[in-house]
Amino acid sequence: MAKGKDVRVRIILECASCVRNGINKELPGISRYITQKSRHNTPNRLELRKYCHYCRTHTIHGEIKK
């Protein structure tokens, strides 16, 4: 049996520029990705460069709380 909490957890990555700029004028919405991370290897918040469909460019997507 597993001891304690699960090592791999599901996280949500959200576009930082969409959140900072508010609602985009061309396309309203905020880009979000769902992925997994290992708590053992990356205990801090995860930030990845992903494609934002609303900004139409690669931007920083940061981990948010559920």
From Swiss-Prot:
Highest taxon in the source lineage: Eukaryota
Keywords attached to this Swiss-Prot or TrEMBL record, sorted alphabetically, are:
Chloroplast, Plastid, Ribonucleoprotein, Ribosomal protein
Q: Name one GO biological process term.
A: translation
Q: Where in the cell is it found?
A: Plastid, Chloroplast
List GO molecular-function terms, semicolon-separated.
structural constituent of ribosome
Q: Which SUPFAM superfamilies match?
A: Zn-binding ribosomal proteins
Where, if anywhere, are coiled coils annotated?
A: none
| Listed Pfam families | Ribosomal_L33
- GO CC, one annotated term: chloroplast
Q: Which family does it belong to?
A: Belongs to the bacterial ribosomal protein bL33 family.
Q: What is this protein called?
A: Large ribosomal subunit protein bL33c
- Origin species, per record, is Dioscorea elephantipes (Elephant's foot yam)
What's the encoding gene here? rpl33
